[in-house]
Amino acid sequence: RYVLGSLETNGEYKPNFLDYQTYLSWQPTKRWQLDLIGNISENHYNFRPEDRNTNFGTMENVKNFQVYFDGQEKDLFRTFFGWLALTHKLKDNKTSVSLIGSIFTTKEQERYDIQGQYWLTQTETSENLGVGTYMQHSRDYLKATVGNVKLMTRRTTDHHHVEGALLWRMERVTENSAEYEYRDSAGYNVPHTGKDLYMIYSLRARNELRANRFEGYLQDNWNFRTGNDSVPTLYTLNYGVRFAHWNFNGETLISPRVSLNIVPGWNRNLAFRVATGLYYQAPFFKELRDTTTLNGVTYAKLNQKIRSQRSIHLVGAMDYSFRMLDRPFKFSAEIYYKMLSRLTPYVVDL
């Protein structure tokens, strides 16, 4: 409330926030373990603006912008998150199997009707440069639920740590949004055509996403050595592949990656690392919204032709550990190359 009260717009700010988190772990036997993570968050934002007074321009040309408001804004953001994992260690003590389930749900409401009458004046002469009114309206509702079920296994031996998993994700999102902004300047509607009445901004969106993702990965972390048995060169090779399929756009992705860490025997204070891989960033609801404008009204629809953003990484790095002034230091250097493609731009509301 104190931060909001320092803004240029004076008014009555009433934010309320609730956040509850919990983590529980139960191990009935040496081979079974149950873990639970929960989070509840709710944020109410109530705002009734009164006036705003802003000075801007140069020292020789100062202007004053003053607004008086009517109306209010009421927002609600509520989220629930739950995560449950059941892990079983096999008798060989090298293999474990986990069944993991999680669910995330959110409800968002942005509602406001605010009208403002404004005056723009020249500070030195009190000359009236402009007068007008505007009205902003919004009824935005969003509900989303994302559920996951994951089966994961791990196996550790003397030189290998193998991990693999299969995952199914359910996505359900419903959006119903209506926004507009009306401006009137000295008796003329803006924009003014002389014939039709248009809003300077109008948005309508009614969308529903019902999709499923299927994902999986398999990777191995291999430790080995070469050279002199007394002071060998140490290697850590990590390699794997990840796959994913999304039935919303029918896209199937395969993402291999590999990295190698080397600690040379001739100087254990040095460490080298090289890595490469093909990475994808799958879109979600925000990136799916595609807008088209017809007769002054912007409509938001979901783009089923969208594709995941893609990047090829090449990385080389070096670490050098040393002591100076009786203190430990580490010098690190890294060079990387990223080839980005299929980027998805979108607008962020500020």
Give residue ranges: language-model regions:
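Membrane-embedded beta-barrel scaffold of Gram-negative outer-membrane proteins
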Residues: 96-102, 107-112, 305-350
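Outer-membrane beta-barrel translocator domains and adjoining extracellular loop/strand segments
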Residues: 3-9, 47-57, 61, 110-118, ...
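Periplasmic-side early beta-strands and strand-to-turn transitions of outer-membrane beta-barrels
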Residues: 1-74, 112, 342
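Short glycine/proline-enriched turns and hinge-like loops at secondary-structure junctions
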Residues: 233, 250-253, 327-329
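Surface-exposed extracellular loop regions of Gram-negative outer-membrane beta-barrel proteins
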Residues: 50-55, 266-314, 335-350
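Membrane-embedded beta-strand positions in outer-membrane beta-barrel channels/transporters
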Residues: 19-21, 79-85, 100, 146-152, ...
